[in-house]
């Protein structure tokens, strides 16, 4: 069995670790949902290194998928994939540096993700 959950939806790294503890007591492995680029990836790598039942990490490292998410001009990350896995960085914090000057001079484009509803009207993930 596998628990696939998103740190953003569950309340952050601390709450994710609590979910992992509950899952571990039921012999369920963790596979973090990782859809949001290099900052989310860095947090996921550190989370994976901190829980004993971490199994896999969803990632967007293919050239067809990354769509600029891993642009070194915007975010410098010490996390690089090696032999189909990430090595945990010894850099402080999450091991990333955000180029704030680049972002200040960039144009912001608002985007709202689709909000899907089930037949009964309840909200669901997309």
Name every feature range the model reports, one short phrase each.
Residues 2-4:
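Short, small-residue-biased leader/transition segments that mark boundaries at the very start
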Residues 7-10, 61:
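Short, acidic/turn-prone active-site loops that include or flank metal/cofactor-
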Residues 10-22:
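Active-site-adjacent beta->alpha loops and helix N-cap segments on the catalytic face
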Residues 27-28, 53:
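Short glycine/serine/threonine/alanine-rich loop segments
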Residues 31-33, 46:
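A contiguous pocket-lining binding segment that forms or flanks enzyme active sites
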Residues 38-126:
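Flexible C-terminal active-site loop/helix
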């Amino acid at each position: 069995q596998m628990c696939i959950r998103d740190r953003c939806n569950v309340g952050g790294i601390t709450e994710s670790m609590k979910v992992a503890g509950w899952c571990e007591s039921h012999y369920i492995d963790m596979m973090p949902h990782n859809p949001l680029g290099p900052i989310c990836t860095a947090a996921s790598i550190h989370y994976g290194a901190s829980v004993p039942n971490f199994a896999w990490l969803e990632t967007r490292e293919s050239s067809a998928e990354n769509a600029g998410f891993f642009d070194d001009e915007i975010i410098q990350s010490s996390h690089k994939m090696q032999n189909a896995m990430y090595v945990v960085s010894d850099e402080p914090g999450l091991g990333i540096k955000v180029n704030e000057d680049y972002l200040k001079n960039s144009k912001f484009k608002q985007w709202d993700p689709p909000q899907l509803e089930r037949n009964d009207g309840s909200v669901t993930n997309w």
